From Swiss-Prot:
Low complexity bias (residue ranges): 1-19
Region (Disordered): 1-42, 89-218
Gene Ontology terms: cellular component: nucleosome; nucleus
InterPro entries: H1/H5, Histone_H1/H5_H15, WH-like_DNA-bd_sf, WH_DNA-bd_sf
Chain ranges of the H15 domain: 37-110
Protein location: Nucleus; Chromosome
Identification of the protein by name: Histone H1
Keyword check for Electron transport: no
Function: Histones H1 are necessary for the condensation of nucleosome chains into higher-order structures.
Amino acid sequence: MSETAPVAAPAVSAPGAKAAAKKPKKAAGGAKPRKPAGPSVTELITKAVSASKERKGLSLAALKKALAAGGYDVEKNNSRIKLGLKSLVSKGTLVQTKGTGASGSFKLNKKPGETKAKATKKKPAAKPKKPAAKKPAAAAKKPKKAAAVKKSPKKAKKPAAAATKKAAKSPKKATKAGRPKKTAKSPAKAKAVKPKAAKSKAAKPKAAKAKKAATKKK
Protein backbone atom coordinates (compact mmCIF):
# COMPACT_ATOMS: atom_id res chain seq x y z
CA MET A 1 0.00 0.00 0.00
CA SER A 2 2.85 2.36 0.69
CA GLU A 3 4.13 1.99 -2.89
CA THR A 4 0.81 2.97 -4.56
CA ALA A 5 0.26 6.23 -2.59
CA PRO A 6 2.97 8.34 -4.31
CA VAL A 7 1.58 7.45 -7.77
CA ALA A 8 -1.94 8.84 -7.02
CA ALA A 9 -0.67 12.21 -5.71
CA PRO A 10 0.55 13.70 -9.05
CA ALA A 11 -2.81 12.92 -10.73
CA VAL A 12 -4.65 15.12 -8.20
CA SER A 13 -2.21 18.05 -8.48
CA ALA A 14 -2.53 18.34 -12.31
CA PRO A 15 -6.10 19.83 -12.39
CA GLY A 16 -5.09 22.36 -9.73
CA ALA A 17 -2.22 23.57 -11.92
CA LYS A 18 -4.59 24.04 -14.90
CA ALA A 19 -7.00 26.05 -12.79
CA ALA A 20 -4.14 28.24 -11.58
CA ALA A 21 -3.09 28.80 -15.19
CA LYS A 22 -6.63 29.87 -16.22
CA LYS A 23 -7.02 32.41 -13.41
CA PRO A 24 -4.35 34.86 -14.70
CA LYS A 25 -6.15 35.01 -18.06
CA LYS A 26 -9.35 36.10 -16.36
CA ALA A 27 -7.43 38.65 -14.36
CA ALA A 28 -5.84 39.98 -17.54
CA GLY A 29 -9.28 40.24 -19.17
CA GLY A 30 -10.62 42.14 -16.17
CA ALA A 31 -7.71 44.62 -16.29
CA LYS A 32 -9.07 46.25 -19.52
CA PRO A 33 -10.01 49.92 -19.06
CA ARG A 34 -13.70 50.51 -18.83
CA LYS A 35 -15.37 53.06 -21.05
CA PRO A 36 -16.74 56.11 -19.23
CA ALA A 37 -20.43 55.76 -18.66
CA GLY A 38 -21.16 59.51 -18.78
CA PRO A 39 -20.90 61.94 -21.73
CA SER A 40 -17.56 63.30 -22.93
CA VAL A 41 -16.05 66.63 -21.85
CA THR A 42 -16.86 68.31 -25.18
CA GLU A 43 -20.52 67.32 -24.90
CA LEU A 44 -20.73 68.72 -21.36
CA ILE A 45 -19.08 72.00 -22.44
CA THR A 46 -21.44 72.46 -25.42
CA LYS A 47 -24.47 71.82 -23.18
CA ALA A 48 -23.25 74.29 -20.57
CA VAL A 49 -22.50 77.00 -23.17
CA SER A 50 -25.83 76.50 -24.97
CA ALA A 51 -27.70 76.67 -21.63
CA SER A 52 -26.13 80.02 -20.70
CA LYS A 53 -28.14 83.16 -21.51
CA GLU A 54 -25.23 85.59 -21.51
CA ARG A 55 -24.91 87.59 -24.74
CA LYS A 56 -21.15 88.10 -24.49
CA GLY A 57 -20.53 84.39 -23.96
CA LEU A 58 -19.81 82.07 -21.05
CA SER A 59 -16.53 82.65 -19.22
CA LEU A 60 -14.19 79.84 -18.17
CA ALA A 61 -14.99 80.33 -14.46
CA ALA A 62 -18.74 80.19 -15.13
CA LEU A 63 -18.26 77.10 -17.29
CA LYS A 64 -16.40 75.32 -14.49
CA LYS A 65 -19.19 76.19 -12.05
CA ALA A 66 -21.80 74.77 -14.45
CA LEU A 67 -19.80 71.57 -14.90
CA ALA A 68 -19.26 71.19 -11.14
CA ALA A 69 -23.00 71.66 -10.57
CA GLY A 70 -23.62 68.79 -13.03
CA GLY A 71 -21.41 66.48 -10.93
CA TYR A 72 -18.23 66.75 -13.02
CA ASP A 73 -14.89 66.82 -11.15
CA VAL A 74 -13.44 70.12 -12.37
CA GLU A 75 -10.23 70.07 -10.31
CA LYS A 76 -9.01 66.70 -11.61
CA ASN A 77 -10.12 67.32 -15.21
CA ASN A 78 -8.99 70.95 -15.54
CA SER A 79 -6.59 70.15 -18.41
CA ARG A 80 -9.29 68.15 -20.21
CA ILE A 81 -11.68 71.11 -20.04
CA LYS A 82 -9.09 73.41 -21.64
CA LEU A 83 -8.29 70.90 -24.39
CA GLY A 84 -12.00 70.39 -25.02
CA LEU A 85 -12.55 74.14 -25.39
CA LYS A 86 -9.65 74.45 -27.87
CA SER A 87 -10.91 71.53 -29.97
CA LEU A 88 -14.46 72.91 -30.07
CA VAL A 89 -13.19 76.34 -31.16
CA SER A 90 -11.01 74.78 -33.88
CA LYS A 91 -13.93 72.69 -35.16
CA GLY A 92 -16.22 75.73 -35.22
CA THR A 93 -18.85 74.57 -32.73
CA LEU A 94 -17.84 77.33 -30.30
CA VAL A 95 -16.81 80.93 -30.93
CA GLN A 96 -14.35 82.69 -28.61
CA THR A 97 -15.66 86.19 -27.94
CA LYS A 98 -12.95 87.27 -25.46
CA GLY A 99 -9.41 86.24 -24.52
CA THR A 100 -7.03 83.78 -26.17
CA GLY A 101 -6.60 80.02 -25.86
CA ALA A 102 -8.69 78.29 -23.19
CA SER A 103 -9.13 81.48 -21.14
CA GLY A 104 -11.83 83.97 -22.06
CA SER A 105 -15.50 83.81 -22.96
CA PHE A 106 -17.10 81.30 -25.30
CA LYS A 107 -20.33 81.32 -27.23
CA LEU A 108 -22.15 78.66 -29.25
CA ASN A 109 -21.69 79.10 -33.00
CA LYS A 110 -25.10 79.36 -34.65
CA LYS A 111 -23.71 78.72 -38.16
CA PRO A 112 -20.94 76.12 -37.84
CA GLY A 113 -21.31 75.08 -41.49
CA GLU A 114 -20.22 78.50 -42.74
CA THR A 115 -17.00 78.49 -40.72
CA LYS A 116 -16.07 75.05 -42.08
CA ALA A 117 -16.81 76.19 -45.62
CA LYS A 118 -14.64 79.29 -45.15
CA ALA A 119 -11.78 77.19 -43.79
CA THR A 120 -11.96 74.86 -46.81
CA LYS A 121 -12.05 77.81 -49.23
CA LYS A 122 -9.02 79.49 -47.65
CA LYS A 123 -6.83 76.38 -47.98
CA PRO A 124 -7.16 76.01 -51.80
CA ALA A 125 -6.61 79.77 -52.22
CA ALA A 126 -3.21 79.49 -50.50
CA LYS A 127 -1.98 76.69 -52.85
CA PRO A 128 -2.06 78.61 -56.18
CA LYS A 129 0.34 81.21 -54.76
CA LYS A 130 3.33 78.86 -55.14
CA PRO A 131 2.98 78.30 -58.92
CA ALA A 132 2.28 82.03 -59.38
CA ALA A 133 5.65 82.80 -57.77
CA LYS A 134 7.42 80.34 -60.08
CA LYS A 135 5.96 81.78 -63.29
CA PRO A 136 7.61 85.22 -62.95
CA ALA A 137 10.96 83.51 -62.41
CA ALA A 138 10.50 81.54 -65.64
CA ALA A 139 9.37 84.70 -67.41
CA ALA A 140 12.46 86.51 -66.14
CA LYS A 141 14.68 83.79 -67.58
CA LYS A 142 13.12 84.08 -71.05
CA PRO A 143 14.12 87.74 -71.63
CA LYS A 144 17.75 86.78 -71.01
CA LYS A 145 17.55 84.35 -73.91
CA ALA A 146 15.90 87.04 -76.02
CA ALA A 147 18.75 89.40 -75.14
CA ALA A 148 21.23 86.77 -76.25
CA VAL A 149 19.37 86.51 -79.56
CA LYS A 150 19.49 90.29 -79.93
CA LYS A 151 23.25 90.29 -79.41
CA SER A 152 23.82 87.80 -82.24
CA PRO A 153 22.59 90.19 -85.01
CA LYS A 154 25.34 92.60 -83.97
CA LYS A 155 27.86 89.96 -84.89
CA ALA A 156 26.05 89.51 -88.20
CA LYS A 157 26.28 93.26 -88.86
CA LYS A 158 30.09 93.21 -88.67
CA PRO A 159 30.46 90.84 -91.67
CA ALA A 160 28.03 93.05 -93.60
CA ALA A 161 30.18 96.10 -92.83
CA ALA A 162 33.27 94.16 -93.90
CA ALA A 163 31.51 93.22 -97.14
CA THR A 164 30.72 96.89 -97.81
CA LYS A 165 34.37 97.80 -97.15
CA LYS A 166 35.51 95.09 -99.55
CA ALA A 167 32.97 96.31 -102.10
CA ALA A 168 34.33 99.83 -101.68
CA LYS A 169 37.89 98.60 -102.21
CA SER A 170 36.99 96.53 -105.28
CA PRO A 171 36.19 99.57 -107.54
CA LYS A 172 39.74 100.81 -106.97
CA LYS A 173 41.04 97.51 -108.23
CA ALA A 174 38.68 97.76 -111.17
CA THR A 175 40.04 101.20 -112.03
CA LYS A 176 43.58 99.89 -111.80
CA ALA A 177 42.66 97.04 -114.05
CA GLY A 178 40.99 99.48 -116.43
CA ARG A 179 44.12 101.59 -116.93
CA PRO A 180 46.12 98.87 -118.73
CA LYS A 181 43.30 98.61 -121.25
CA LYS A 182 43.94 102.23 -122.31
CA THR A 183 47.65 101.51 -122.67
CA ALA A 184 46.77 98.46 -124.74
CA LYS A 185 44.69 100.62 -127.08
CA SER A 186 47.51 103.15 -127.57
CA PRO A 187 49.83 100.63 -129.28
CA ALA A 188 47.05 99.88 -131.71
CA LYS A 189 46.84 103.56 -132.59
CA ALA A 190 50.58 103.70 -132.98
CA LYS A 191 50.45 100.74 -135.34
CA ALA A 192 47.72 102.46 -137.33
CA VAL A 193 49.81 105.64 -137.61
CA LYS A 194 52.94 103.86 -138.84
CA PRO A 195 51.39 102.71 -142.11
CA LYS A 196 50.59 106.33 -142.92
CA ALA A 197 54.24 107.19 -142.53
CA ALA A 198 55.06 104.30 -144.79
CA LYS A 199 52.64 105.65 -147.37
CA SER A 200 54.33 109.04 -147.25
CA LYS A 201 57.66 107.36 -147.90
CA ALA A 202 56.12 105.49 -150.78
CA ALA A 203 54.75 108.76 -152.19
CA LYS A 204 58.14 110.43 -152.11
CA PRO A 205 59.76 107.90 -154.47
CA LYS A 206 56.89 108.38 -156.89
CA ALA A 207 57.52 112.11 -156.91
CA ALA A 208 61.21 111.51 -157.47
CA LYS A 209 60.42 109.21 -160.40
CA ALA A 210 58.15 111.86 -161.92
CA LYS A 211 60.93 114.47 -161.70
CA LYS A 212 63.36 112.13 -163.39
CA ALA A 213 60.89 111.46 -166.20
CA ALA A 214 60.46 115.20 -166.72
CA THR A 215 64.18 115.76 -167.04
CA LYS A 216 64.47 113.00 -169.59
CA LYS A 217 61.72 114.54 -171.73
CA LYS A 218 63.53 117.80 -171.80
